[in-house]
A protein has these predicted regions:
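Glycine-rich phosphate-binding active-site loops on the catalytic face of alpha/beta enzymes
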Residues: 22, 98-108, 137-151, 176-204
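N-terminal amphipathic alpha-helix/helix-capping segment at the start of soluble metabolic enzymes
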Residues: 1-36, 109
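Glycine/Thr-rich beta-alpha phosphate-binding loop at enzyme active sites
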Residues: 90, 94, 118-165, 204
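Acidic (Asp/Glu)-rich catalytic clusters
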Residues: 37-44, 69-73, 88, 108-112, ...
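Catalytic cores of alpha/beta
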Residues: 78-93, 122-135, 166-197
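Alpha-helix-loop-beta-strand connector modules within alpha/beta enzyme cores
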Residues: 61-80, 99-102, 107-123, 153-178
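Hydrophobic faces of well-ordered beta-strands that scaffold small-molecule active sites
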Residues: 18-24, 48-50, 78-80, 95-97, ...
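Glycine-rich, proline-tolerant flexible connector loops at the mouths of alpha/beta enzymes
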Residues: 47-59, 142-149
Length: 204
């Protein structure tokens, strides 16, 4: 999709989208789920992280496989979540794990075949632990106010800056990030590689 067509549809600029990792949530999709995934992939984001963490592994693998097919059609990297075995069966070498699962699988030496191992961190201590465990990417949050974390104050850009200064791997911001608000520019100025966006990308 060219810049002119994107502008006509009121979509964000492709330069911004190249710094966005889309986090999926089928419960928020504005249209049928795979149709929404296709729309997202047409925008060429940095990656699509198939979160859907409420699913058991068999159901997750089935759905993630459908998302993967769309991602491959548009040459958008696809990152699986929670289930490394499902990822490997699908030929995916990128996984995002909660910190507790990263520790579990790293101790079991189950992550050797992955080139990308991401995890979420919410404190400096967690970031240090994730780096010790060999994470190749950190997601730090939540940075801004978000309905996904109702009642919890955001950690803010000072926290993001601290994690970016600490880490020798890419750090992605997450939580309450909206395009067209100046937030992307703000998180990039903190040293982040980009921003993870769920709600807005599931409704775009």
């Amino acid at each position: 999709m060219c810049r002119k067509e994107m502008a006509k549809r009121g979509l964000p600029d492709e330069d911004v989208l190249s710094r966005v990792a889309v986090v999926t949530n089928r419960h928020l999709a504005a249209r049928p789920y795979l149709e929404q995934i296709r729309r997202v992939c047409q925008l060429r984001p940095e990656a699509v992280i198939v979160r859907e963490k409420d699913l058991e592994e068999e159901d997750y693998a089935r759905l993630a496989g459908q998302v993967l097919a769309v991602c491959r059609e548009y040459q958008v990297p696809c990152v699986y979540h929670t289930y490394p075995e499902a990822a490997l069966r699908a030929g995916v070498d990128a996984i995002h794990l909660p910190l507790a699962l990263l520790k579990k699988y790293r101790e079991a030496e189950s992550l050797k075949e992955f080139s990308h191992v991401g995890t979420s961190v919410h404190s400096v201590r967690e970031a240090e632990e994730a780096l010790r465990l060999g994470a190749t990417c950190l997601t730090a949050g939540h940075i801004y106010l978000t309905d996904c974390k109702k009642g919890l104050p955001p950690r803010g850009t000072a926290f993001l800056q601290e994690i970016c200064a600490l880490a020798d791997v890419p750090v992605w911001a997450i939580g309450g990030i909206h395009m067209g608000t100046g937030q992307m520019k703000e998180i990039l100025s903190c040293g982040a590689a980009g921003g993870c966006i769920m709600s807005e990308m599931m409704r775009i």
